[in-house]
Amino acid sequence: RDLVRSRGLGDVYKRQGQSYEIKGVRHAIDSGLALIPEDRRREGLVLMHSVEENLIVPIFDKLKRGLLLENKKVADIAERSISDMAIKTHSRKTPAFNLSGGNQQKIVVGKWLNSAPSVLLLDEPTAGVDVGSKREIIDKVRDFVGENRAAIFISSDILELISACDRFIVFYDGKVTATYNRSEITEEVLQYAIQNEC
């Protein structure tokens, strides 16, 4: 995605405080970054492929022995992800296009969690998703952060941000205009900040 390739978005810092340049998608994955894109159907999934195939995309190379996939490992990872993410599907072999929007998004989140990232970037991760799936996805993100990892959550849904985030950074016209901790935030405060009124 352009987010990975762009050079004008600022520096990325590892925990040791050293900045580094993202050189491509594979380098980003190997560096512990994962992106949940806004458009899951165009950028997050290969719709004609199975649930299983989608779930292993980021770790495909790690599941090969020579030129062949280790089918038992693939099946185990897919079944575990389907269970962990509560993906409703008849089979791990079901094409992704047959699933509901909420279950498709769970595949996208699940496949990137399979890559064991240290930083998860989520761009409107619950757009067009049913209420139950929204809650499940947000819970998974909070579990991820609870493992001493980081998530950057981008959303136009203020209530969703409040339920999902511990720290809030508001950008306006390309600049940071406000930052808040969870204890400081309310819907009204965040709404005013977004409108550049505080």
Cite the ranges covered by each PLM segment.
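Single conserved hydrophobic/aromatic residue that forms the stacking wall/gate
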Residues: 1-13
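A short, proline-enriched helix->beta-strand linker immediately N-terminal to the Walker B motif
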Residues: 114-118, 124
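ABC-family nucleotide-binding domains
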Residues: 123, 130
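Helical segment within the ABC ATPase nucleotide-binding domain
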Residues: 134-147
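A short, surface-exposed alpha-helical micro-motif characterized by mixed small hydrophobic
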Residues: 161-163
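Short, glycine/charged-rich "phosphate-handling" switch motifs in NTP-dependent
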Residues: 167, 179
